[in-house]
Amino acid sequence: MIRSNKPPENNCLLYNKGLMPYLAAHAWQRSLLRQRIDYPNLEDVLILLEHPPVYTLGQGSSLEFLKFDPNQSEFEIHRIERGGEVTYHCPGQLVGYPILNLHRHRQDLHWYLRQLEEVIIRVLAVYDLKGDRLPSLTGVWLEGRKVAAIGIKVSRWITMHGFALNVCPDMTGFSRIVPCGITDKPVGSLAQWIPGITCEEVRVHVVQAFAEVFGLELVDS
């Protein structure tokens, strides 16, 4: 359990999962979101997991950012309700799905996106790495390389989707897309700065940073 200075009613259920198919995780998020719309007093949730190789496209994203025929892809492709363009998930990338009731935090989507970035920036600081924000863009960069992508969906101020931090993934899948539709910014992973780093060790720091940034007490579930 990671404790913050907030009272116990600010519990957040932590689900530390391993490799999970994308559609299973998506259905789980939708179920948790619906429960919290119907019962607003339910606790916040943070899911941490990894996905098998999969491409996802935001609700308004363009197929022009795929460098292959989507009808002949070796990996799954799913168009989902988050914002943003195409991104790639695979093992070695730590994905976080917060299901938060922003009525208990702040009803401000820009604030929420900046808070998610702050979580990643604090994790990088543990390794003496300086994460950067870029004007008008969402995500976190290291020395000009994007190491964390963020895309969210909010319904009645309940959040779903979240962040994807490249820890030690096979980066070849990114070469088949224009990640997040950004043509002039390369993608990076923490392993390029910290050889041997693993998602397991990074999970601990993500949990700590998330608790601090959102003022929550994370409870293993």
UniProtKB/Swiss-Prot annotation:
<dbReference type="InterPro" id="IPR000544">
    <property type="entry name" value="Octanoyltransferase"/>
</dbReference>
<dbReference type="Pfam" id="PF21948">
    <property type="entry name" value="LplA-B_cat"/>
</dbReference>
<keyword id="KW-0808">Transferase</keyword>
<protein>
    <recommendedName>
        <fullName>Octanoyltransferase</fullName>
        <ecNumber>2.3.1.181</ecNumber>
    </recommendedName>
</protein>
<feature type="domain" description="BPL/LPL catalytic">
    <location>
        <begin position="40"/>
        <end position="218"/>
    </location>
</feature>
<comment type="similarity">
    <text>Belongs to the LipB family.</text>
</comment>
<comment type="function">
    <text>Catalyzes the transfer of endogenously produced octanoic acid from octanoyl-acyl-carrier-protein onto the lipoyl domains of lipoate-dependent enzymes. Lipoyl-ACP can also act as a substrate although octanoyl-ACP is likely to be the physiological substrate.</text>
</comment>
<feature type="site" description="Lowers pKa of active site Cys">
    <location>
        <position position="146"/>
    </location>
</feature>
<dbReference type="GO" id="GO:0033819">
    <property type="term" value="F:lipoyl(octanoyl) transferase activity"/>
</dbReference>
<dbReference type="InterPro" id="IPR004143">
    <property type="entry name" value="BPL_LPL_catalytic"/>
</dbReference>
<dbReference type="GO" id="GO:0005737">
    <property type="term" value="C:cytoplasm"/>
</dbReference>
<keyword id="KW-0012">Acyltransferase</keyword>
<feature type="binding site">
    <location>
        <begin position="162"/>
        <end position="164"/>
    </location>
    <ligand>
        <name>substrate</name>
    </ligand>
</feature>
<dbReference type="InterPro" id="IPR045864">
    <property type="entry name" value="aa-tRNA-synth_II/BPL/LPL"/>
</dbReference>
<dbReference type="GO" id="GO:0036211">
    <property type="term" value="P:protein modification process"/>
</dbReference>
<feature type="active site" description="Acyl-thioester intermediate">
    <location>
        <position position="180"/>
    </location>
</feature>
<feature type="binding site">
    <location>
        <begin position="82"/>
        <end position="89"/>
    </location>
    <ligand>
        <name>substrate</name>
    </ligand>
</feature>
<keyword id="KW-0963">Cytoplasm</keyword>
<comment type="pathway">
    <text>Protein modification; protein lipoylation via endogenous pathway; protein N(6)-(lipoyl)lysine from octanoyl-[acyl-carrier-protein]: step 1/2.</text>
</comment>
<dbReference type="InterPro" id="IPR020605">
    <property type="entry name" value="Octanoyltransferase_CS"/>
</dbReference>
<feature type="binding site">
    <location>
        <begin position="149"/>
        <end position="151"/>
    </location>
    <ligand>
        <name>substrate</name>
    </ligand>
</feature>
